[in-house]
């Protein structure tokens, strides 16, 4: 599984693609189909949102398809909205684990 992450604040050149561990049992796993890129993500990457500390994966919303987990059938299309990027990786990933309250 790959994710876009930054380890220091800065311009777009601080973004890198890295491998991350697979999600644990009991988590809803969503294969991302689209993730927003917006001014909020730019502010996070530049260090203007003090609550987000590196290393961090940007992305506060997106949509995808459930591929594993509890609560929804596999293949269900879902929209994900925050608090991604605050204490958990954002939506700029191939796969996102989502808490029950973070999905529609």
Regions found by a protein language model. Give the residues of each.
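NAD(P)H dinucleotide-binding glycine-rich loop of Rossmann-like/cofactor-binding domains
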Residues: 79-104
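Generic structural detector for well-ordered beta-strands
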Residues: 19-21, 97
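Residue-level signal for short segments within beta-strands and strand-turn junctions
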Residues: 5-8, 46
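Residue-level marker for the onset of beta-strands and adjacent loop->beta junctions
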Residues: 16-18, 52, 92
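Conserved catalytic-core motifs of eukaryotic protein kinase domains, centered on the activation segment
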Residues: 42-44, 90-91
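Short N-terminal binding/cap micro-motifs at the start of the first secondary-structure element
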Residues: 10-17, 39-41, 74
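Extreme N-terminal starter segment of soluble prokaryotic enzymes
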Residues: 1-2
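Glycine-rich beta-strand-centered segment in the early N-terminal region that forms part
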Residues: 21-36, 46-87
